[in-house]
Amino acid sequence: MPPKFDPNEVKFLYLRAVGGEVGASSALAPKIGPLGLSPKKVGEDIAKATKEYKGIKVTVQLRIQNRQATASVVPSASSLVITALKEPVRDRKKEKNVKHSGNIPLDEIFEIARKMQHKSFGKNLASVSKEILGTAQSVGCRVDGKNPHDIIDAINAGEIDVPEN
């Protein structure tokens, strides 16, 4: 016999979803079905929560308590960098392995680093900023018109001052 249902118990599920799209409820069913939730309704909640990250893969945190699911986006560094580029939405089915060729100001990188600081193991904002610059390089964009790695070298050399917080 299964254990008694505790209404105060909180469970967390982490899923990868494409922003603004209702995922296949057949993919959600094995994860959500045993918790007594409707996969279709949860899929719509996820689509609502991720609509500002339209077309970008993001991690979604589902907080499940008393058979109620609340979806919240846990943005990754790459999704924040891609949204900072403000590029038009591309058709995911037609274009694969897209290289982003935009340009981000350095101040925007520092803002993303502040958002990601709680998740990073970096000791200060400079080290977290270097992590974000590395992500920007792998995404394929430029920072202030330069290669992100050149800016990392400039931070290491002390040529660029990084704010404390």
From Swiss-Prot:
One Gene Ontology cellular component term attached to this UniProt record is: cytosolic large ribosomal subunit
| Signal peptide extent | none
Q: Which domain of life is it from?
A: Eukaryota
What's a Pfam family this protein contains? Ribosomal_L11
In terms of Gene3D superfamilies, this protein maps to:
Ribosomal protein L11, C-terminal domain, Ribosomal protein L11/L12, N-terminal domain
What GO terms describe the biological role, i.e. biological process, of this protein? Answer: translation
**CDD domains reported for this sequence:** Ribosomal_L11
GO molecular function term, any single one: structural constituent of ribosome
What are the entry keywords?
Answer: Cytoplasm, Ribonucleoprotein, Ribosomal protein
Q: Where in the cell is it found?
A: Cytoplasm
Assembly behavior: Component of the large ribosomal subunit. Mature ribosomes consist of a small (40S) and a large (60S) subunit. The 40S subunit contains about 32 different proteins and 1 molecule of RNA (18S). The 60S subunit contains 45 different proteins and 3 molecules of RNA (25S, 5.8S and 5S).
Q: What is the role of the protein in this entry?
A: Component of the ribosome, a large ribonucleoprotein complex responsible for the synthesis of proteins in the cell. The small ribosomal subunit (SSU) binds messenger RNAs (mRNAs) and translates the encoded message by selecting cognate aminoacyl-transfer RNA (tRNA) molecules. The large subunit (LSU) contains the ribosomal catalytic site termed the peptidyl transferase center (PTC), which catalyzes the formation of peptide bonds, thereby polymerizing the amino acids delivered by tRNAs into a polypeptide chain.
Q: Which family does it belong to?
A: Belongs to the universal ribosomal protein uL11 family.
HAMAP family named among the record's database cross-references: Ribosomal_uL11
Protein name in the entry: Large ribosomal subunit protein uL11
Q: Which gene encodes it?
A: RPL12
